[in-house]
């Protein structure tokens, strides 16, 4: 926690300074590399961690070293992770995917925006100072066309996005030659298909089957292609967004960039305060990762926060507004049906989902079926025209472990499975949202139910939190559940920050949540046996055993914290080469003792071997040369 709390003015000024001085930057002793594909423009970024050599012998004057291979790792930071790229937030990022989108020839530019709300915002001169300065003319599918990655996959087309993803998911592990680094324990994948090498055809096949999605709105060409599916690396989502009482456009852009730096695979903008439209435009134009939203939040703002006043027309206009800005996936709470609401009456914590409670209130006040459910096919038509993926929301998720796995939760899940099939009729990509608060022994059932009733569509969960007693530490309570459900097959984990249940997260909270969830996702990849997942662990263990402190810091998920903790007790430079740390000191370091035992054993082996040879020499008569038949 910070020693002094900044005022709102200071927070905004700090965020503005961050944006004004933003430059591409790499982590310590890392460099950005690119691996090219066969499609034009496919140039996949990765971070390569440079390592120091290992001392293997020689003398103090002439030491002998063995080189250690650089370790390539998945990188979500986009242009912000490349020191060679000039960053200008006012202009936005380069439109990486635009040539691919245009080459397909199935989209057209819109001369007039489809959303009445967007038209009104653009006509309001009072918003000029807040508006993103760059111009992006939105596109939509030509009449009679669908422009989704699912549509292309079903037609047997391998898109540049699919090739980009295949290269990215392999994480450059073909560059690693060391058998020590390539060693990996067998995983337990619970039925997942994990090929030794991920090909573009495998990506296409998984998307075509609905087991994976590529969130990639045609109006968000700045995004770098990524995939969400249980047969790929487990992904992590970060939530950002302003509220009625805190945060600004500058702060949200800062949080976006910060999130991608610390490993967010996607970011959800959950803004509920002022200038939602303008904030989202700044975020999208500067985001290298897919952006998701919950459209019902903004729709509610348009009717002054009165749930009963929501209409399909207002919601539809909001979908068009956001789709034409470039939102990559919508959370839609279409499974909160009128008949399910009474099932929550006996719950300890009722309906805790904001979107779920909004729709439940609307259903009860009108005594009508959820209009999102009633108009679901129209929602799919909109999504198919822009390639917006659907994240079917779990509006009836449990908000306490007492309410876990109850009738309401699974009734909604079964309905989401029915809606998945409808979305697939329109070639719309779908993932399913899950809980929530679930004790450890009840977590796996959530995964098996989802796979069975939602036809193996990717699962996307908030945690789940495994206990309710730790406000302020819910990134820990949920990280436990996230690691478990990721192992069981969950495709993406929505992070939880230390502020969960307490307040809106700040920049440091975002980092803490992401680091916790990157650990959970990586632990799940190891447990599943994802090919190459153990390389970084092996490199870290080797560096640790060899007391290569700088390499240990640089291989860490958070090099800065690792270095800071070490330097609290051994700040001098000599501490970076010492064969011990402050935990045990020089006399009790287990790894130093292990090295001494190993050296002693090797020396003993040599000594015993020499004694054996001496005895053999004497037994043969002590002759230096033997006749050939005696040798």
From Swiss-Prot:
Binding site for [4Fe-4S] cluster: 581, 584, 589
UniProt protein name: Phosphomethylpyrimidine synthase
Enzymatic class: lyase
UniProt record similarity statement: Belongs to the ThiC family.
Binding positions for substrate per the UniProt entry: 239, 268, 297, 333, 353-355, 394-397, 433, 460
Gene Ontology cellular-component terms listed: cytosol
Organism: Escherichia coli O6:K15:H31 (strain 536 / UPEC)
Coiled-coil features, chain-numbered ranges: none
EC number: 4.1.99.17
GO molecular function, one term: carbon-carbon lyase activity
Role played: Catalyzes the synthesis of the hydroxymethylpyrimidine phosphate (HMP-P) moiety of thiamine from aminoimidazole ribotide (AIR) in a radical S-adenosyl-L-methionine (SAM)-dependent reaction.
GO biological process terms on file: thiamine biosynthetic process; thiamine diphosphate biosynthetic process
Textual note on the cofactor: Binds 1 [4Fe-4S] cluster per subunit. The cluster is coordinated with 3 cysteines and an exchangeable S-adenosyl-L-methionine.
Entries under Pfam families matching the protein: ThiC-associated, ThiC_Rad_SAM
């Amino acid at each position: 926690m910070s020693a002094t709390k900044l005022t709102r003015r200071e927070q905004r000024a700090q965020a503005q300074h961050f944006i004004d001085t933003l430059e591409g930057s790499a982590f310590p002793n890392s460099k950005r590399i690119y691996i090219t594909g066969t499609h034009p423009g496919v140039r996949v970024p990765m971070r390569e961690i440079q390592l120091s050599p290992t001392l293997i012998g020689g003398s103090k004057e002439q030491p002998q070293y063995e080189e250690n291979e650089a370790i390539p790792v998945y990188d979500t930071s986009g242009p912000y992770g490349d020191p060679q790229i000039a960053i200008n937030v006012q202009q936005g990022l380069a439109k990486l995917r635009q040539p691919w989108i245009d080459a397909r020839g199935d989209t057209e530019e819109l001369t007039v925006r489809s959303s009445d709300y967007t038209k009104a915002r653009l006509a309001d001169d009072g918003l000029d100072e807040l508006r993103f300065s760059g111009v992006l003319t939105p596109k939509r599918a030509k009449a009679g066309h669908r422009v989704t990655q699912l549509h292309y996959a079903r037609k047997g087309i391998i898109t540049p996005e699919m090739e980009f993803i295949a290269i990215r998911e392999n994480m450059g592990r073909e560059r690693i030659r060391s058998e020590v680094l390539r060693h990996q324990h067998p995983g337990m994948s619970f039925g997942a298909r994990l090929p030794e090498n991920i090909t573009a055809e495998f990506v296409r096949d998984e998307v075509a089957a609905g087991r994976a999605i590529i969130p990639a709105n045609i109006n968000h060409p700045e995004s770098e292609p990524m995939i969400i599916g249980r047969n790929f690396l487990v992904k992590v989502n970060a939530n950002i967004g302003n509220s009625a009482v805190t945060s600004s456009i500058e702060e949200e852009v800062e949080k976006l960039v910060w999130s991608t730096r610390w490993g967010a695979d996607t970011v959800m903008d959950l803004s509920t305060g002022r200038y939602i439209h303008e904030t989202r435009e700044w975020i999208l134009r500067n985001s290298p990762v897919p952006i998701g939203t919950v459209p019902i939040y903004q729709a509610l703002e348009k009717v002054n926060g009165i749930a009963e006043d929501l209409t399909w027309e207002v919601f539809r206009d909001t979908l068009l507004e956001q789709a034409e800005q470039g939102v990559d996936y919508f959370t839609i709470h279409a499974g909160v049906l009128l008949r399910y609401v009474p099932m929550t009456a006996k719950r300890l914590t009722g309906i805790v989902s904001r979107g779920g409670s909004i729709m439940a209130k609307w259903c009860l006040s009108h005594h009508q079926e959820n209009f999102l459910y009633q108009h679901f096919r129209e929602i799919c038509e909109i999504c198919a025209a822009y390639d917006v993926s659907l994240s079917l929301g779990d509006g009836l998720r449990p908000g306490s472990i007492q309410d876990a796995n109850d009738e309401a939760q699974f009734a909604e899940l079964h309905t989401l499975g029915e809606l998945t099939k409808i979305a697939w009729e329109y070639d719309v990509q779908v993932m399913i949202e899950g809980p929530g608060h679930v004790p450890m022994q009840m977590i796996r059932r959530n995964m098996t139910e989802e796979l069975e009733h939602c036809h193996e569509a990717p699962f996307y969960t908030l945690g789940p939190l495994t206990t309710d007693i730790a406000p302020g530490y819910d990134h820990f309570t949920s990280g436990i559940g996230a690691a478990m459900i990721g192992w069981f097959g969950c495709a993406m984990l929505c992070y939880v920050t230390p502020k969960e249940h307490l307040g809106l997260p700040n920049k440091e909270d975002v980092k803490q949540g992401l680091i916790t969830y990157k650990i959970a996702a990586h632990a799940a990849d190891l447990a599943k046996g994802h090919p190459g997942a153990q390389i970084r662990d092996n490199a870290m263990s080797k560096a640790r055993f060899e007391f290569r402190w700088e390499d240990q810091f640089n291989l860490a998920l958070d090099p800065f914290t690792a270095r800071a903790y070490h330097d609290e007790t051994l700040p001098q430079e000599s501490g970076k080469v010492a064969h011990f740390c402050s935990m045990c000191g020089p006399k009790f370091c287990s790894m130093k003792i292990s090295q001494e035992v190993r050296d002693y054993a090797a020396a003993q082996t040599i000594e015993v071997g020499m004694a054996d040879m001496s005895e053999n020499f004497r037994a043969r008569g002590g002759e230096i040369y033997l006749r050939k038949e005696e040798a």
